[in-house]
A protein has these predicted regions:
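Short amphipathic alpha-helix adjacent to the substrate-entry channel of hydrolases
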Residues: 74-94
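Conserved hydrophobic/aromatic pocket- or pore-lining residues that grip, position, or stack substrates
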Residues: 30, 40, 62, 83, ...
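Serine-hydrolase catalytic-loop signature spanning alpha/beta hydrolases and amidase-signature enzymes
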Residues: 66-70, 90
Length: 218
């Protein structure tokens, strides 16, 4: 203004977080085959106001990032802290195909989307169970977009998880290949196979066409 005076219109939120109630991630490396490993971040339950029974292992939520060639990091995530502060353990997976672990690691997803990402998330959950860190009878999975697709595949084609949440996930790969926007219209050629030549693979990996295998809450 002409007066050169500054007026404060809004103040930013000043919510504080008790550092002792923040669950800090532990990097984990999970064996997924004889010579291969997948990576993730494990968050144990943490809340200074409550203690779980020493005899009870916590339930687990496995998170699958989008992309699918994106990545998750150890940065503070309030959504993860929501669950860990309420008694859940969380495994945030960087399955094979994720960015940040070498070109060869990222290229492992080539032609294998809906397969090795699912295998790695299930392997991570089972590995934590074998370590005695989580309850194998109370394991769930969650993801959005490409991570939602991985979640649906895990719930449909694997019996590891008892429940899941797919946020705007993909159920029919053929529909995605034919109806998506132009910028990503050929993206699936590298992740699944060329369309329509590989149509059988698209159908085989689409949870929508195998709904009989989905027998848990979603």
């Amino acid at each position: 203004t002409e007066s050169r005076e500054i007026s404060i219109l809004y103040h930013s939120a000043s919510a504080s977080v008790d550092a002792n109630s923040v669950s800090c991630p532990t990097p984990v490396t999970v064996p997924v085959s004889e010579n291969e490993f997948a990576h993730g971040f494990f968050y144990p339950p943490q809340n200074t106001n409550f203690d779980g029974s020493p005899a009870d292992l916590p339930p687990l939520i496995v998170k699958s990032h989008g992309g699918p060639t994106g990545q998750t990091t150890a940065a503070f995530n309030v959504k993860i802290q929501y669950w860990t502060s309420r008694g859940f353990a969380v495994l945030d997976m960087n399955y094979r195909g994720s960015t940040g672990f070498s070109r060869a690691y990222r290229r492992r997803l080539k032609g294998a989307w809906g397969c090795i990402d699912v295998e790695d998330c299930a392997a991570g959950a089972r590995w934590l169970s074998n370590q005695g860190w989580v309850d194998p009878q109370r394991m769930a999975m969650s993801g959005g977009s490409a991570g939602g697709y991985t979640t649906l595949c895990a719930l449909t084609f694997d019996n590891c998880f008892s429940a899941g949440a797919s946020h705007y996930g993909i159920g029919d790969l053929s529909a995605l290949a034919t109806d998506t926007h132009k910028f990503e219209s050929r993206y699936l050629d590298g992740l699944i196979g060329p369309w329509p030549e590989a149509e059988a693979d698209y159908r085989a990996r689409s949870p929508l066409h195998h709904a009989e295998g989905l027998d848990c809450p979603v």
